[in-house]
Amino acid sequence: MESQTTFKYESLAFTKLSHCQWTDYFLSVPIDESELDVITREIDILKPEVMELLSSQGDDETSKRKVLLIQLLLSLGLAFHFENEIKNILEHAFRKIDDITGDEKDLSTISIMFRVFRTYGHNLPSSVFKRFTGDDGKFQQSLTEDAKGILSLYEAAHLGTTTDYILDEALKFTSSHLKSLLAGGTCRPHILRLIRNTLYLPQRWNMEAVIAREYISFYEQEEDHDKMLLRLAKLNFKLLQLHYIKELKSFIKWWMELGLTSKWPSQFRERIVEAWLAGLMMYFEPQFSGGRVIAAKFNYLLTILDDACDHYFSIHELTRLVACVERWSPDGIDTLEDISRSVFKLMLDVFDDIGKGVRSEGSSYHLKEMLEELNTLVRANLDLVKWARGIQVPSFEEHVEVGGIALTSYATLMYSFVGMGETAGKEAYEWVRSRPRLIKSLAAKGRLMDDITDFDSDMSNGFAANAINYYMKQFVVTKEEAILECQRMIVDINKTINEELLKTTSVPGRVLKQALNFGRLLELLYTKSDDIYNCSEGKLKEYIVTLLIDPIRL
């Protein structure tokens, strides 16, 4: 049994983490407000030209061209400018979908149409791909001569549900041939680069800002690119970069004014730019600029709380913190010690800071719902700490459920609603609190991905609370068998997520997109079993440089 004295974090063998390397750099980057104005004016001049393309009247071929244009707008990061037009086009086109797709024999066209309709909530049947299979149900080998078609089908396969068996076959077929294309090097360099990026992470699960940056580079190398669209995409991304740097400056200054850095042990993560980047993963559009700063503040708080639970808190101290959060009074600080006092003070400061904004908007329910979720989160962390220290041993299923809460799955999604105004009203918070199948699936996915990534380090640190560990013990299997089974679960969970995104009608589409974006966040953090949030080099550094430092040439 753990002693009721304060647990000493020095006794744990956790690796010391480096401090944020980016803060000084971004504070020094100048922002020219006049440049923002010039870019905005040119964007406003070009947008009507796209509107004209989207509003053109015609036959089924015209409808088909519009759907293909919508996918191009999505890939270039421009679709948010035309959401109403896109919604109307797809609703009209879906009513005559059989006429539009009936005689189409082009693999890329069908794959793109499938992706677009499903992305916007229209359940286009996967049977549209049967025209590309033989009597044995296998995809025709002649398709392998169409590199872009294979790539489009690979992308489409990631929108499959639990009953889209043909897409399972499509994924095997396309993965094999795309890897062969990479190895053979017969495609043009920009196509090979797109294939490599897509195999790392398909658009379905990638960050929208990353998709846009990569696809702009690809599209510029296409001989038949539309110069107007390319110019608009570049201007749009340049404007986003300027917005992002302004947000980072604001967030970094807020963090510096807190003056808490000297109070944290060296094991705690000063992930400042990373906390903002996690907010960018939830929404990239300029109208959510304030929301990203809010999300960054919450992400910083949640990172510190996670570190305190992993590295410092005794069960006794965390129990006292749980009681303070439930009472939610500054008076409770006096009952806490050292780090827990600073953590609770940070909680109060963040909620007070965010509260000033939402109260002025007449949306005080935001705070009530978020505080309730914070209560749930710290209680889940208490359970996890008890399990980690061997005080209690949960089942594999219980760990995945409670661990999904402790991973901040529900809190991260709910906190992203704050910067969305009336788009995410009270019903959005109530929906998350009801624990719908979609969000429970996302939470389980996050827990499994995190525990697969951290298994070796958790075990070497004596940290028992890990899904792989519990699966091995409960089902008497090896580490390798447990990991393979959990990876299979993640594949099935992704299909369930896709299914629930199509079936859920109780909340607005933008709220559903936040759920999808949380799934994307998980993929970005844990793809290839590489916890990039805790590694300042590698892929995370690449994202920061690509999105914020490398200028896009206009």
UniProtKB/Swiss-Prot annotation:
Gene3D superfamilies the UniProt entry points to: Farnesyl Diphosphate Synthase, Terpene synthase, N-terminal domain
High-level lineage: Eukaryota, Viridiplantae, Streptophyta, Embryophyta, Tracheophyta
Highest taxon listed in the record's lineage: Eukaryota
EC number, as in UniProt: 4.2.3.40
Chief site of localization: cytoplasm
Domain observations: The Asp-Asp-Xaa-Xaa-Asp/Glu (DDXXD/E) motif is important for the catalytic activity, presumably through binding to Mg(2+).
Disulphide bridges: none
Description of what induces expression: By wounding.
Keywords: Cytoplasm, Lyase, Magnesium, Manganese, Metal-binding
Organism: Arabidopsis thaliana (Mouse-ear cress)
Subcellular location(s) of the protein: Cytoplasm
Catalytic activity field: (2E,6E)-farnesyl diphosphate = (Z)-gamma-bisabolene + diphosphate
Sequence motif DDXXD motif, location on chain: 306-310
Stated name of the protein: (Z)-gamma-bisabolene synthase 1
Cofactor(s) required, per the database record: Mg(2+); Mn(2+)
GO annotations of cellular component type: peroxisome
One BP annotation, GO: sesquiterpenoid biosynthetic process
UniProt xrefs under InterPro entries: Isoprenoid_synthase_dom_sf, Terpene_cyclase_plant_C1, Terpene_synth_N, Terpene_synth_N_sf, Terpene_synthase-like, Terpene_synthase_metal-bd, Terpenoid_cyclase/PrenylTrfase
Function in brief: Involved in sesquiterpene (C15) biosynthesis. The major product is (Z)-gamma-bisabolene with minor amounts of (E)-nerolidol and alpha-bisabolol.
